[in-house]
Structure formats: C-alpha cells, structure tokens
C-alpha cells in the first residue's frame, strides 16, 4: 500500500513508504584474515555482553591484555584454511548474500517486499541495512536472525542491535522479529534429506551420526536460556525422521571458549572417545548452523576429522549445512512468508 501524495503541500520533501523489508541476519565475519581485521572483528564479538556475561572489570583485562593480542593470529590462520579465495571473503558472507538474493527471487510475487542481509558483527551492519531499507520506503521490517534454535547469545543480541538502531531514529519502521523454528517440520525434513543425500555419496555407512550444535556456558542454561532444550528436540526429531536409535545418534556441543563448564557432551571429546572405543566410521551434521562457516568447515571438517583419525578412527564425513541450496531456501522462505502475514 502506497501513501496518497495528493494532499501533500507543494514543498513537501519526497518520501518513500509502503514497502516491507526482510532483513536476514547471521553472526558475522571478519573482512579479512589479517591481524587487524581479525582483531577488529573479535573485539566487537567478545565485548558483547550477551556473548560474555562476565563483569567487564573481570573480563576486559583478560580480553585486552591477552586474548586480543594472541587470538587474532590463531583465528586468522584458521580462516585462511576455509577462506573463499575466489571472492576474497568468508563462506558465511558468500552464503548469506546468496540467501538474500535467492530470497528476493523467491518473493518476487510480492511487489512491496524488499530483501536485504546483515551481520551482527562486522559488515554490513544491522544498523546500516535497517537505514537502507527505511530509505527505500520500508516502514515495516521483518528481522530474521538466522538461528533455528533460540539463544540469548545469538538471536537476542541480533534483536538488541536492531532495537538499538531504532532508538536513534525519529521515524521508526515497525519491527517484527522472527522466532526460532527448531521443531518446524520443513526444517527437520530438510536436515534429514541432507543427511540421506550425503550418505548416499559414500561407499560406507557410519556407525554413529553426531548432531553437533554450538555450545553455550552451562551457567546461561541454568539462568533460563532455552537453547539446550531446543537443540535436544531438534536432535530427537531428526533421529526419529531418519529411523535411527540412541545407539547410533548423539547430540553434542562444540566451540567452547574459556574456563567455564559448557553444555555437554563436548563434540571434540566425544569424537576422540568414539575412536578410542573402537568406532571406525562416523558422520557429523551441524543442524544449528544455517550456513557453513569456521565452526563447521574448520572445527568439524578439519579438526574433528583429524582427531578421529589420530585416535584410531577410519572413516569421517562432515555433512554440509543447508546453505543456499534448494532445501535450505525452502525452509527460510516458509518462515519468511509466515512472518509476513498481515503485512502483505
């Protein structure tokens, strides 16, 4: 719906309105693998109070005194292993841009809808893309944090950043935030199909399928974060859809950081133990990641595979994320069309 301009004064400034924006938001990515780019990205990420809930008086001396002086080089080297050399960017940026472009194509029947993308950390920022959508005439925006399972350290911090931008705007767009979809049947079916398709390309059958989710500190869970429960439900629904038993399917948690206890069982320890216990063939899927990134391509496909082989395992397969494939886009489109109801 477009505003009636016939009643405007002759000197009224041109104003665009009547559009609906869809903003896809993922975690973030450094602009490069060099020390400066990595430090800038890690500083923004690790100063987020949703990510590290310690008091700044306790955390900042460690962060600025140690972590930001040593970790950028280490993480930069890891990114170099999985960097998209063709586009000179991380694959997370590549896939998120592709998802945005494909979503726009899928929604071309909705003439008033504009689709864009942003990153919580790094560029393009959430604030810049909300501003761009507003300038394009979007007086309503669907904000889509690309996380199937809700966590304060992921979904909530995306929402926080969007709300922070709105605080600075005189003419705020209406904002609708997308909830989690951890038990959506289309999402579960897409995960199951990706497992079946990938395993069909192998000449061996895994004895164990791990569903590895990003971890969070146990203290966050105990304070009421629903993430653990949602991961477990996703895992159970996927196991049931694949017809597997608890003896050949496990939910595990990866990417722990710092001295705190995190959600368990830990993926890295589980992979080691499986190999040490005589399991020779395993496959790993990352249901909580919409797109492949450092945590899947390097931590699982490289580090976990190496650990499994070093401890006696023989066959290891990493099942790619849904990324910008047809099944993955079907999931995202379903969620977006559902959340657009009443606005189009």
Curated annotation (Swiss-Prot):
Pathway: Porphyrin-containing compound metabolism; protoheme biosynthesis; protoheme from protoporphyrin-IX: step 1/1. It catalyses: heme b + 2 H(+) = protoporphyrin IX + Fe(2+). GO terms for biological process: heme biosynthetic process. Its main location: cytoplasm. It is an enzyme of class 4 (lyase). Fe cation binds at residues 214, 295. This is Ferrochelatase. The lineage of its organism: Bacteria, Pseudomonadati, Pseudomonadota, Alphaproteobacteria, Hyphomicrobiales. The gene is hemH.
